[in-house]
Amino acid sequence: ESLSKLIGIPWKVHGRDYNGVDCGGLVILASRVLYGLTVPDMWEYGAENNLQVAREAVNDLSLFSDPIEGVEDGAIAVMKFKDVFHYGLVVKGKILTISGEKQKSLMRRIPTHYKVTFYRIRKEAE
């Protein structure tokens, strides 16, 4: 039931609740709702600095998570294609994600056409 409530949430820049989320907000919300884990909000970006903030967020992941090999439910998925970083959360072997304006959150297969790195959230990060 919790997962079904997370699917179909509309896109909203800086959104952090069921009324709307961006990719970072979806990771924060879904981590808490599905796994009881707290993810710090490191995605304070705007149109003019998205790339810079996304790069910094990748570095900040080490503050509360560890890179892992392979797929694990509850892990943050960092997808990189060209110079763009995108975030999602692994749920039931797929990625819960939202892509951008006019989109809604959905489950996707783990992509194979660009680099994906997975991070396990440390319990003490809470």
PLM features: residue spans?
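N-terminal capping segments
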Residues: E1-L63, K82-F85, R122-A125
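A broad, low-specificity signal marking well-ordered, structured residues that form hydrophobic/aromatic
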Residues: I9, G93, V116
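Residues in well-ordered beta-strands of folded domains
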Residues: K12, V78, L96, Y119-R120
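...with weaker cross-activation on analogous glycine-rich loops/strands in unrelated enzymes
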Residues: M42-P111
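Short, Lys/Arg-rich amphipathic alpha-helical interaction segments
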Residues: K104-E126
